[in-house]
Amino acid sequence: MNFLLCIFKGVYVIKLIQRFFKLESAGGILLLFSAVVAMLLANSPLSNQYNDFLNLPVSLQIGSFSINKTLIHWINDGFMAVFFVLVGMEVKKELFEGALSTYQQAIFPAIAAIGGMVIPAVVYWFIAKQDPSLANGWAIPMATDIAFALGIMALLSKQVPLPLKIFLLALAIIDDLGAIVVIALFFSHGLSVQALIFSAVAIIALILLNRFKVSALCAYMVVGAILWASVLKSGVHATLAGVIIGFSIPLKGKKGERPLDDFEHILASWSSFVILPLFAFANAGVSFAGIDVNMISSPLLLAIASGLIIGKPVGIFGFSYISVKLGLAKLPDGINFKQIFAVAVLCGIGFTMSMFLASLAFDANAGESVNTLSRLGILFGSTVSAILGYLFLKQTTKLS
């Protein structure tokens, strides 16, 4: 009898887990859970074990070629490159077939996204300009964590109009493109010509695979791995390799199959339920030990938080509103400016993407206090944006 009861309970638990992973908000919930666990560990008696785990040396060697990094660097440079493969595929799909495939569809979210990148950077600069050592952090509040933003929106999925969801997706995709450009232009250092040549050869190989509409995903994975390793060694940030790999995968194969859709389907679950939660676990572990009032009012924390809470909504809403009033773009049918403002506030959730940019802007040499304050600013700004965004979205969609 006890045995049967155990089996029944096991089946019930499995069904609950399956139901959870089918939720639209599952990815966002798992992200939040990972971040909370990281913060609890970082402020518990297990903090040393948590940090030691993240700093475990992990090596990869093939003949004379080797990559030696700590676990946290493998997560940030390796796993996040896989995430950017997905970003590259999503951008390509939307540009050729989706919400960004025509000028009329693309111009409104494009202008909004530009505002959402420029104004947060300006807000950051205005607050942090008194300290030249903080100049590198201007890109941190530019980012939007699309998984989290969509997770919050999914909580109200039944009352959120479809055009508003499409606007958020298009906005986030253009935002990702902006982040890619920023990483390429401002966070690549000490370039190696030899590694860049290897990277160029790998890119040519990917172009040929795409040109001949090769559908075998293993071919892209092998060449992509070579490209990632070459880019990593070149001094250009390795996540750019992910974007190039994503763009190289064909939308259609020779026999009408859809390689990009197949690979996107595989990576989407890994990204939502493994890669991003793991990144959050590795980077959200902020220790509050030794933090006083003076640190909380520091220019760095205020600049990042203000960029996310104020800069994002002002930039997105302001640019989109002006573009419509000047006749440069048209407000999508089925939504209003109050809902655009709610989405703009929601885009202040920088979380994992802002933390990723912070890890590039301030390395270990910047000092523990700088890294701690930047993460605190991101967590505070993202939390406030999530709460306000949810409340505004709930109110505006209810009114509609």
Swiss-Prot record:
Membrane-crossing segments per the record: 26-46, 71-91, 107-127, 137-157, 166-186, 189-209, 212-232, 233-253, 273-293, 299-319, 340-360, 373-393
Sections of the chain in a coiled coil: none
Enzymatic reactions: Na(+)(in) + 2 H(+)(out) = Na(+)(out) + 2 H(+)(in)
Protein species of origin: Haemophilus influenzae (strain PittEE)
Listed PANTHER family: NA(+)_H(+) ANTIPORTER NHAA, SODIUM ION/PROTON ANTIPORTER NHAA-RELATED
Disulfide bonds: none
Purpose: Na(+)/H(+) antiporter that extrudes sodium in exchange for external protons.
HAMAP family in the record: NhaA
Topological category with respect to the lipid bilayer: Multi-pass membrane protein
Pfam families registered for this protein in UniProt: Na_H_antiport_1
Keywords: Antiport, Cell inner membrane, Cell membrane, Ion transport, Membrane, Sodium, Sodium transport, Transmembrane, Transmembrane helix, Transport
GO biological process: one example: regulation of pH
InterPro entries: Na/H_antiporter_dom_sf, NhaA
An annotated Gene Ontology molecular function: sodium:proton antiporter activity
Protein localization: Cell inner membrane
Gene name linked to the record: nhaA
Name used for this protein in its record: Na(+)/H(+) antiporter NhaA
Family: Belongs to the NhaA Na(+)/H(+) (TC 2.A.33) antiporter family.
One GO term describing the cellular component: plasma membrane
